[in-house]
């Protein structure tokens, strides 16, 4: 046994290893000559063709197996030109420790320099090691993610892994030096910091206001896409990652980032999309909106306005809106108006509009050398041309229409930015980039006036705050599994927007009751922090 160990380990190119490679190469050469000889025999037309049976299959299998062996032995073959490296590797057992514990990963910071993730020195059974620490626990878990030697990494920890570990070595010598530092533990490699666009104070307030309720908050700058808030509840503590998080079913889905991946019916907030399409197409007429509602056929339930149900619960009779135009229809969030408007515009217009607004796609919001972080926009299946009622439902944000809070925030930002949607971004060093034009500048300007009116005297008037000039659209999305979801999207200030937002509260009821107050509180703090004039 000692002799075998000596032959295998004492030198990078021992006699036994040379013999094994020689036998393998001779066997491969013999098999190759047999195959070539067989091809030559087949080429003789006057002789019967030999049958390629088990023998040929065996040769192919052996050749494939040999290729695998060659691949596995490449480090030994290349090692002949790097004897110092081979000798070094033979002297160190890499199984004794995990190199990931030894790297001093860089910090993850918010836009103001507040530390969101850092590496701290700890003592383990194998000696000193580095452990990732997240000062705010669950507040940034879905964005920052986690980095754990046992379970890998997620979020920015995964997307920016190379930068956080010190950057990508530029040469084989750099790789070798990094390996020596890790294995000998003579010097702890230090990573680079990554700065995000988030504001820790705003993010923490969003998480606090959502509380135990499931939901999401997205706040961004319309002009450059810088995300100030990307909050999702319920969350998890990245300081306490364990196997149960991934193995046990969680009815509350704490690992799901509802802001970027949660799909919800957008309800009345989707009327902004239909209104933008109508204005781009030059619509300027009025639509009769009866109090008792409207439907495409007697076979289907009537689509009604929320005032109808409020009056019915109070024992009153509602007179209806009568004939109204788009401005009043959007400010008062009339389902009857937009259901008819969507059917009037038609299936082709609806499909073209949702494609222009980038539904059914993904957008990169954070990109590093080792990965990307995405946001889903939504999911809207094709509506059959014969399904007029399905189109009517979709036009008021119900039916088969689903959207993420991040997508609805992007739509609000496009209205605030004269129709141009700028890619939401998490990493401060990334350059702003437009993802498309959602609507014409004139359409965006008119929508800003209408959405300001919606807060001043329409469905969002409950959060009207002096000095903020909030413009927005409430949404109450029907939910087959319980109480309606509460939405509020918009921007502020209305005349010169600096921040756009979307707030979703699952099972929150009316948008003006649950989601809108959260947006108002965030905007008040944003003004104190200097994000708003």
What positions do the PLM features span?
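Periplasmic/cell-envelope proteins involved in peptidoglycan metabolism and beta-lactam response
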Residues: 1-245, 254, 263, 268, ...
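Beta-lactam-recognizing serine transpeptidase/beta-lactamase-like catalytic domain environment
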Residues: 181, 223-268, 273-507, 511
């Amino acid at each position: 046994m000692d002799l075998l160990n000596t032959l295998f380990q004492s030198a990078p190119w021992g006699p036994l290893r040379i013999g094994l490679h020689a036998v393998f190469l001779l066997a491969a050469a013999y098999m190759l000559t047999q195959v070539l000889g067989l091809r030559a025999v087949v080429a003789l037309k006057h002789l019967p063709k030999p049958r390629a049976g088990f023998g040929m299959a065996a040769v192919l299998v052996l050749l494939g197996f040999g290729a695998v062996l060659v691949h596995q032995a490449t480090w030994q073959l290349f090692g002949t030109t790097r004897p110092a490296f081979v000798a070094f590797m033979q002297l160190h057992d890499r199984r004794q420790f995990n190199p990931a514990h030894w790297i001093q990963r860089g910090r993850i910071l918010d836009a103001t320099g507040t530390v969101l993730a850092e590496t701290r020195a700890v003592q383990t059974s194998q000696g000193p090691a580095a452990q990732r620490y997240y000062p705010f626990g669950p507040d940034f878990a879905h964005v920052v993610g986690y980095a754990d030697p046992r379970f890998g990494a997620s979020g920015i920890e995964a997307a920016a892994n190379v930068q956080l570990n010190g950057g990508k070595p530029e040469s084989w010598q750099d790789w070798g030096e990094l390996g020596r530092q890790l294995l000998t533990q003579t010097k702890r490699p230090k990573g680079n910091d990554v700065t995000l666009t988030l504001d820790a104070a705003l993010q923490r307030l969003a998480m606090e206001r959502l509380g135990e309720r499931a939901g999401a908050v997205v706040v961004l700058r319309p002009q450059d896409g810088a995300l100030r808030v990307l909050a999702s509840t319920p969350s998890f503590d990245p300081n306490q990652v364990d196997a149960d998080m991934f193995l046990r079913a969680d009815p509350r889905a704490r690992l799901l980032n509802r802001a970027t991946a949660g799909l919800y019916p957008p309800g009345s907030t989707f009327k902004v999309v239909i209104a933008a399409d109508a204005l781009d197409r030059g619509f300027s007429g009025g639509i009769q909106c009866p109090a008792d509602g409207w439907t495409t056929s007697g076979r289907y339930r009537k689509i009604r306005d929320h005032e109808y149900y409020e009056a019915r619960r109070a024992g009153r009779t509602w007179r209806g809106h009568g004939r109204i135009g788009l401005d009043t229809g959007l400010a008062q969030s009339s389902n009857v108006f937009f259901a008819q408007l969507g059917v009037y515009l038609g299936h082709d217009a609806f499909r073209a509009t949702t494609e222009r607004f980038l539904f059914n796609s993904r957008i990169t919001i954070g990109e590093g050398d080792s990965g990307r972080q995405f946001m889903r926009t939504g999911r809207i299946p094709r509506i059959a041309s014969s399904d007029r009622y399905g189109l009517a439902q979709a036009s008021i944000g119900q039916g088969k229409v689903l959207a993420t809070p991040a997508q609805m925030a992007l739509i609000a930002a496009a209205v605030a930015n004269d129709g141009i949607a700028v890619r939401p971004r998490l990493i401060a060093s990334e350059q702003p980039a437009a993802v498309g034009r959602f609507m014409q500048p004139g359409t965006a300007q008119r929508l800003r006036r209408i959405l300001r009116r919606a807060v001043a005297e329409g469905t969002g008037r409950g959060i009207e705050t002096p000095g903020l000039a909030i413009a927005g659209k409430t949404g109450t999305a029907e939910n087959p599994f319980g109480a309606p979801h509460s939405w509020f999207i918009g921007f502020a200030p209305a005349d010169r927007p600096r921040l756009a937002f979307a707030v979703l509260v699952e099972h929150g009821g009316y948008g003006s009751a649950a989601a809108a107050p959260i947006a108002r509180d965030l905007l008040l703090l944003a003004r104190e922090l200097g994000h708003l004039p």
